[in-house]
Swiss-Prot record:
Organism: Homo sapiens
Principal place of residence: membrane
Cellular component GO terms, alphabetical: ciliary membrane; ciliary transition zone; MKS complex
Protein's UniProt name: Transmembrane protein 17
Pfam families found in the cross-reference section: Transmemb_17
Length: 198
């Protein structure tokens, strides 16, 4: 299951615009860019632990909502249920994109993961954490703080990984372009020598 081509292209263009380092003139290490692994171990470990933590967060949130449901105003009941449903759906998509983008070094998927984390998931969990009208219980605050720490770390780690991936892809592109030009020059020399012989 892959992202549709228009979405992949837009996320790829967005990633190149945001994460490319225009000040760099060459690769940072002596290894060839084809052999360098740019997926992030820290990000992958965070995604792994987040995968096991999220069901715990979900069950705790549902239990706490059940306990305080009768004292919440009607509009907060609707808002909290909607936010928990949104977080659940977004988290499933976000973790999938994070795994695929990081392990397979796919920039559009990792950019989608980063955008979902930063623009949707983080504001929703901060709403649950800091809204005084929700009368958060101590367990709720604890699980929301841990989830927020996961998200904050993943946003930073994904940004750094994306920068590294985009820079590596740019180096690969320039090396392939250089190889093509070198091959074309070699062909031109051979043609000139053949013409001169004739």
């Amino acid at each position: 299951m892959e992202l549709p081509d228009p979405v992949r292209q837009r996320l790829g263009n967005f990633s190149r615009a945001v994460f490319s380092d225009s000040n760099r003139t060459g690769p940072e290490s002596n290894e060839g860019p084809e052999n360098e692994m740019v997926s992030s171990l820290a990000l992958q470990m965070s995604l792994y632990f987040n995968t096991y933590y999220f069901p715990l967060w979900w069950v705790s949130s549902i239990m706490m909502l059940h306990m305080k449901y009768s004292i919440l105003p009607d509009y907060y009941k609707f808002i909290v249920i909607t936010v928990i449903i949104l977080i659940t759906l977004i988290e499933a998509i976000r973790l999938y994109l994070g795994y695929v983008g990081n392990l397979q070094e796919k920039v559009p998927e990792l950019a989608g993961f980063w955008l979902l984390s930063l623009l949707l998931q983080l504001p929703l969990i901060l709403f649950l954490l800091f809204n005084e009208g929700l009368t958060n219980l101590p367990l709720e605050k604890a699980i929301h703080i841990i989830f927020t720490l996961f998200l904050a770390f993943q946003v930073v780690a994904a940004f750094l990984t994306l920068r590294k991936m985009v820079n590596q892809l740019a180096v690969r592109f320039h090396l392939q372009d250089f190889d093509r030009l070198s091959a074309n020059r070699g062909d031109m020399r051979r043609m000139r020598s053949c013409i001169e012989e004739i």
